[in-house]
């Protein structure tokens, strides 16, 4: 009788062990299958993406296309060569502003804000929320709106915003990036407003996307009401028209 009980318990234990092995085996098989499938899918996507760029004539002097999920480079051209950033500089000015000050703050436009090339969208003495000026900076590439944000930053924080823009670039190992102006316009001495390589710009954009993605959301509007419900400003990015 005792032997039958022992044999029965042994049989049950063996059965449990076999069941556990089967469950674990199925789990690892499923995991490996999914892992291999995902790897193969990713390789196919990479191959297809690269073929698109290989058959496309990129006219820009420098460019880079990076998959943000794993930093895989799909395409690059002179990606480590520093170049003038022009209005890309505004994006970083705006990012530093929203990282330190509320968009609800009131800003009065000064005479100096409108005394530059590309000004004329806003006028001295007008009052705006920081959010309004941010939208003008991002959507219309307004130099006067960007200047008003930068000036207000300096008056409120007590530091020139360009210093903080450069500090952020340095702290994040964006070695090729350097700013001289908040708008990207050249200095009075003729130096570029900002310089940086496509690779470091891609890194900078990833940081902005992870920290304050609304910056990109705001710049995606084709048009926005600004001076009133019947008056709108149009995005300078013509790709949004398509």
Residue ranges and their predicted role:
Residues 116-152, 233-242:
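Conserved catalytic neighborhood of penicillin-recognizing serine enzymes
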Residues 36-83, 99-103, 115:
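Short pre-catalytic segments that frame enzyme active sites
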Residues 13-28:
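Hydrophobic membrane-insertion alpha-helices, especially the h-region
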Residues 99-112, 212-220:
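Short, well-structured active-site flanking segments
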Residues 108-124, 165-178:
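Active-site helix/loop module of the DD-peptidase/beta-lactamase fold
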Residues 1-14:
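N-terminal Lys/Arg-rich, disordered targeting/topogenic segments
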Residues 70-71, 84-109, 201:
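Active-site SXXK
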Residues 16, 34-62, 154-242:
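Penicillin-recognizing serine hydrolase domain
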């Amino acid at each position: 009788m005792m032997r039958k009980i022992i044999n029965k318990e042994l049989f049950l234990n063996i059965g449990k062990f076999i069941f556990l092995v089967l469950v674990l085996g199925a789990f690892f098989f499923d995991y490996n299958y999914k892992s291999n499938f995902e790897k193969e899918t990713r390789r196919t996507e990479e191959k297809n993406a690269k073929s698109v760029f290989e058959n496309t004539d990129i006219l820009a002097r420098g460019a880079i296309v990076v998959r943000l999920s794993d930093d895989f480079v799909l395409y690059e051209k002179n990606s480590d060569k520093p170049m003038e950033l022009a209005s890309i500089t505004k994006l970083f000015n705006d990012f530093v502003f929203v990282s330190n000050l509320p968009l609800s703050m009131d800003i009065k436009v000064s005479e100096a804000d409108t005394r530059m090339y590309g000004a004329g969208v806003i006028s001295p003495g007008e009052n705006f929320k920081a959010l309004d000026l941010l939208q003008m900076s991002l959507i219309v590439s307004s130099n006067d709106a960007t200047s008003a944000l930068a000036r207000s930053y300096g008056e409120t924080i007590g530091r020139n915003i360009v210093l903080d823009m450069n500090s952020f670039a340095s702290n994040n190992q964006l070695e090729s990036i350097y700013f001289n102006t908040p708008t990207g316009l050249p200095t009075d001495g003729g130096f570029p407003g900002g310089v940086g390589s496509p690779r470091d710009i891609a890194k900078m954009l990833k940081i902005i996307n992870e920290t304050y993605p609304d910056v990109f959301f705001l710049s995606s509007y084709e048009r926005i009401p600004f001076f009133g419900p019947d008056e709108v400003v149009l995005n300078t990015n013509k790709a949004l028209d398509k």
